[in-house]
Protein backbone atom coordinates (compact mmCIF):
# COMPACT_ATOMS: atom_id res chain seq x y z
CA UNK A 1 0.00 0.00 0.00
CA UNK A 2 2.79 2.44 0.94
CA UNK A 3 4.63 1.53 -2.25
CA UNK A 4 1.51 2.36 -4.32
CA UNK A 5 1.16 5.75 -2.60
CA UNK A 6 4.85 6.50 -3.29
CA UNK A 7 4.43 5.59 -6.95
CA UNK A 8 1.35 7.79 -7.29
CA UNK A 9 3.21 10.64 -5.56
CA UNK A 10 6.23 10.41 -7.91
CA UNK A 11 4.03 10.07 -10.99
CA UNK A 12 2.08 13.16 -9.88
CA UNK A 13 5.33 15.08 -9.37
CA UNK A 14 6.54 14.02 -12.78
CA UNK A 15 3.40 15.37 -14.46
CA UNK A 16 3.50 18.53 -12.37
CA UNK A 17 7.09 19.33 -13.41
CA UNK A 18 6.45 18.33 -17.00
CA UNK A 19 3.53 20.76 -17.08
CA UNK A 20 5.62 23.58 -15.53
CA UNK A 21 8.33 23.07 -18.11
CA UNK A 22 5.80 23.22 -20.91
CA UNK A 23 4.36 26.49 -19.58
CA UNK A 24 7.74 28.18 -19.31
CA UNK A 25 8.60 27.18 -22.87
CA UNK A 26 5.51 28.79 -24.27
CA UNK A 27 6.12 31.98 -22.29
CA UNK A 28 9.70 32.17 -23.51
CA UNK A 29 8.73 31.49 -27.13
CA UNK A 30 10.94 28.39 -27.37
CA UNK A 31 10.66 28.26 -31.14
CA UNK A 32 12.90 31.32 -31.28
CA UNK A 33 10.52 33.44 -33.32
CA UNK A 34 10.33 37.09 -32.31
CA UNK A 35 6.84 38.52 -32.75
CA UNK A 36 6.84 42.18 -33.77
CA UNK A 37 3.36 43.62 -33.30
CA UNK A 38 2.95 47.14 -34.70
CA UNK A 39 -0.13 49.27 -34.10
CA UNK A 40 -0.24 51.90 -36.80
CA UNK A 41 -2.43 54.27 -38.74
CA UNK A 42 -2.05 54.35 -42.51
CA UNK A 43 -2.09 58.17 -42.48
CA UNK A 44 0.61 58.47 -39.80
CA UNK A 45 3.93 59.76 -41.26
CA UNK A 46 5.94 58.20 -38.40
CA UNK A 47 4.28 54.84 -39.14
CA UNK A 48 5.23 55.13 -42.80
CA UNK A 49 8.81 55.95 -41.83
CA UNK A 50 8.97 53.03 -39.40
CA UNK A 51 7.56 50.66 -42.01
CA UNK A 52 9.97 51.89 -44.67
CA UNK A 53 13.06 51.65 -42.50
CA UNK A 54 12.46 48.80 -40.07
CA UNK A 55 9.95 46.46 -41.74
CA UNK A 56 11.79 46.30 -45.05
CA UNK A 57 15.09 45.41 -43.35
CA UNK A 58 13.41 42.90 -41.03
CA UNK A 59 11.75 41.31 -44.05
CA UNK A 60 15.08 40.89 -45.82
CA UNK A 61 17.09 39.71 -42.81
CA UNK A 62 14.69 37.86 -40.49
CA UNK A 63 11.09 37.48 -41.69
CA UNK A 64 12.03 35.59 -44.83
CA UNK A 65 13.97 32.97 -42.86
CA UNK A 66 11.30 32.56 -40.19
CA UNK A 67 13.09 34.28 -37.29
CA UNK A 68 10.59 37.15 -37.01
CA UNK A 69 6.83 37.28 -37.37
CA UNK A 70 5.57 40.77 -38.24
CA UNK A 71 1.99 41.74 -37.37
CA UNK A 72 0.39 44.90 -38.73
CA UNK A 73 -2.47 45.98 -36.46
CA UNK A 74 -4.87 48.65 -37.62
CA UNK A 75 -5.16 51.70 -35.41
CA UNK A 76 -6.80 54.25 -37.73
CA UNK A 77 -6.60 57.83 -36.53
CA UNK A 78 -8.97 59.29 -39.12
CA UNK A 79 -11.47 58.38 -41.84
CA UNK A 80 -8.82 58.23 -44.57
CA UNK A 81 -6.80 55.71 -42.54
CA UNK A 82 -9.93 53.68 -41.80
CA UNK A 83 -10.88 53.54 -45.49
CA UNK A 84 -7.34 52.63 -46.52
CA UNK A 85 -7.37 49.84 -43.94
CA UNK A 86 -10.72 48.57 -45.23
CA UNK A 87 -9.36 48.40 -48.77
CA UNK A 88 -6.13 46.80 -47.52
CA UNK A 89 -8.19 44.07 -45.89
CA UNK A 90 -9.93 43.31 -49.21
CA UNK A 91 -7.07 40.94 -49.95
CA UNK A 92 -6.62 37.80 -47.89
CA UNK A 93 -3.24 36.78 -49.29
CA UNK A 94 -0.65 37.75 -46.66
CA UNK A 95 2.20 38.43 -49.11
CA UNK A 96 0.02 40.60 -51.33
CA UNK A 97 -1.39 42.39 -48.28
CA UNK A 98 2.09 43.21 -46.95
CA UNK A 99 3.22 44.44 -50.38
CA UNK A 100 0.06 46.55 -50.61
CA UNK A 101 0.70 47.92 -47.11
CA UNK A 102 4.25 48.85 -48.11
CA UNK A 103 2.97 50.63 -51.21
CA UNK A 104 0.34 52.55 -49.22
CA UNK A 105 3.06 53.79 -46.89
CA UNK A 106 5.41 54.67 -49.77
CA UNK A 107 2.70 56.72 -51.48
CA UNK A 108 1.09 58.04 -48.29
CA UNK A 109 1.93 61.68 -48.98
CA UNK A 110 0.08 61.45 -52.31
CA UNK A 111 -3.13 59.56 -51.46
CA UNK A 112 -3.63 60.96 -47.94
CA UNK A 113 -3.39 64.56 -49.13
CA UNK A 114 -6.65 64.55 -51.09
CA UNK A 115 -9.05 67.47 -50.87
CA UNK A 116 -11.93 65.30 -49.61
CA UNK A 117 -12.62 61.66 -48.70
CA UNK A 118 -13.89 60.76 -52.20
CA UNK A 119 -10.63 61.91 -53.77
CA UNK A 120 -8.66 60.03 -51.10
CA UNK A 121 -10.67 56.84 -51.66
CA UNK A 122 -10.07 57.02 -55.43
CA UNK A 123 -6.34 57.45 -54.84
CA UNK A 124 -6.27 54.43 -52.52
CA UNK A 125 -8.22 52.38 -55.07
CA UNK A 126 -5.72 53.26 -57.81
CA UNK A 127 -2.99 51.77 -55.64
CA UNK A 128 -5.20 48.75 -54.90
CA UNK A 129 -5.62 48.03 -58.61
CA UNK A 130 -1.89 47.30 -58.72
CA UNK A 131 -2.56 44.40 -56.33
CA UNK A 132 -5.28 42.75 -58.43
CA UNK A 133 -8.19 44.32 -56.58
CA UNK A 134 -11.12 45.38 -58.73
CA UNK A 135 -13.09 48.58 -58.28
CA UNK A 136 -16.10 46.44 -57.34
CA UNK A 137 -14.17 44.55 -54.64
CA UNK A 138 -12.78 47.74 -53.15
CA UNK A 139 -16.17 49.50 -53.20
CA UNK A 140 -17.71 46.52 -51.40
CA UNK A 141 -14.97 46.68 -48.75
CA UNK A 142 -15.51 50.42 -48.31
CA UNK A 143 -19.24 49.87 -47.84
CA UNK A 144 -18.81 46.85 -45.54
CA UNK A 145 -20.06 47.99 -42.11
CA UNK A 146 -19.05 44.71 -40.44
CA UNK A 147 -15.46 45.17 -41.63
CA UNK A 148 -15.50 48.77 -40.39
CA UNK A 149 -16.85 47.65 -37.02
CA UNK A 150 -14.18 44.92 -36.80
CA UNK A 151 -11.36 47.40 -37.46
CA UNK A 152 -12.72 49.94 -34.97
CA UNK A 153 -13.26 47.25 -32.33
CA UNK A 154 -9.67 46.10 -32.81
CA UNK A 155 -8.58 49.67 -32.19
CA UNK A 156 -10.61 49.81 -28.96
CA UNK A 157 -9.11 46.47 -27.86
CA UNK A 158 -5.61 47.78 -28.60
CA UNK A 159 -6.29 50.76 -26.35
CA UNK A 160 -7.54 48.50 -23.55
CA UNK A 161 -5.18 45.54 -23.82
CA UNK A 162 -1.98 47.15 -25.11
CA UNK A 163 -2.42 50.69 -23.78
CA UNK A 164 -1.94 52.11 -27.28
CA UNK A 165 -2.21 55.88 -27.13
CA UNK A 166 -0.33 56.90 -30.26
CA UNK A 167 1.04 55.48 -33.45
CA UNK A 168 3.22 53.70 -34.11
CA UNK A 169 3.22 51.55 -30.97
CA UNK A 170 5.45 48.47 -31.10
CA UNK A 171 5.46 45.29 -29.05
CA UNK A 172 8.23 42.69 -29.17
CA UNK A 173 7.06 39.34 -27.79
CA UNK A 174 4.30 41.04 -25.77
CA UNK A 175 6.67 43.67 -24.31
CA UNK A 176 6.25 47.30 -25.29
CA UNK A 177 9.26 48.60 -27.20
CA UNK A 178 9.99 52.21 -26.41
CA UNK A 179 13.49 52.59 -27.78
CA UNK A 180 14.73 54.54 -30.76
CA UNK A 181 12.99 53.77 -34.01
CA UNK A 182 16.08 53.31 -36.12
CA UNK A 183 16.92 49.83 -37.37
CA UNK A 184 20.23 49.49 -35.50
CA UNK A 185 18.61 50.21 -32.11
CA UNK A 186 15.59 48.09 -32.95
CA UNK A 187 17.69 45.12 -34.04
Explain the meaning of each model-derived region.
Residues 30-48, 70-73:
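Short active-site neighborhood of thiol/selenol oxidoreductases, capturing the structured segment around
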Residues 41, 55, 126-187:
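C-terminal cap of thioredoxin/glutaredoxin-like
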Residues 49-129:
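Structural alpha/beta surface segment adjacent to cysteine/selenocysteine redox centers
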Residues 16-19:
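C-terminal motif of bacterial Sec signal peptides marking the signal peptidase cleavage site
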Residues 21-33:
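Sec-dependent signal peptide cleavage junction
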Residues 23, 47-50:
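Cys/His-rich metal-chelating microdomains
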Residues 39-41, 73-76, 104-105, 173, ...:
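Active-site-proximal beta-strand/loop segments in catalytic clefts of secreted hydrolases
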Residues 3-11:
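Sec-dependent signal peptide recognition
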Amino acid sequence: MLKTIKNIFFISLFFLFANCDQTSQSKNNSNGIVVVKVFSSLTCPHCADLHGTIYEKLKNEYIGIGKVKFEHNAFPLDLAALNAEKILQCTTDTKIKMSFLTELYKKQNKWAAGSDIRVINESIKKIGEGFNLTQDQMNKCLENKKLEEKILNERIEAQKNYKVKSTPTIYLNKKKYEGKRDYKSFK
